[in-house]
Amino acid sequence: MNNNNKIFNNIFQQSYSHANEAHARVNLIGEHTDYTGGYVLPCLLQYKTVVSVAENKKSKTYNAYYEFYREKISFNDFIKSKNKQWIDYLKGCLFVFYDENKTLDNIYLNLLIQSNIPMRRGISSSSALCVAILKSLNDFFNIGYADKHIAILAQKVERNYIGVSGGIMDQMVSSIGIHGKAFFLDCLTLKYELINLPNNYCFELVDSEVQRENRKSAYNERHNQL
């Protein structure tokens, strides 16, 4: 992902103006407590998503290229699609961002999405995608949102647009967390503390190969039960 400017230029015939990244996470303590307002203790992983953006001055369309899928999609509305899941997250971010900033001019964009986060493995690839997109939009439009507010907007995307009744943990640690530190979060008040991890500790993350997709699982049902 170090050659994102070359790839951006090859796809859109221009250089990007802004780029941001967001990382995947693993939760050490606190499953199901984030969306019930409890305490959690996640930390960042090395896997990340990078989103690069520039204004599209050639046409009145949004153009997005996702390197993992090797797929380019163009659109000019924010209607949720039925068969292109990754583009829904981008549309949702744009919808929430413009809804939050109703006085902004509708500027069409070119966006490059690059990621090495394993998908559907329960390490929050979707939250990292939303956070990276929103941070790039925040910089592009020079809004000045704090990282905590970016996390809140990312949660709105997943809840109000995508339709997953998740908590705030994933978005908060992806937006604010620091490598090498655990992220203690009170999910009710959103107060947090960065905690040093002991140097002599080693955490192993094991892939069960069970694919996870909250939109198609009983996640929302479990959320409502609690």
Language model features by range: what are they?
Residues 36, 143-226:
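ATP-dependent small-molecule kinase catalytic core of the GHMP/sugar-kinase superfamily
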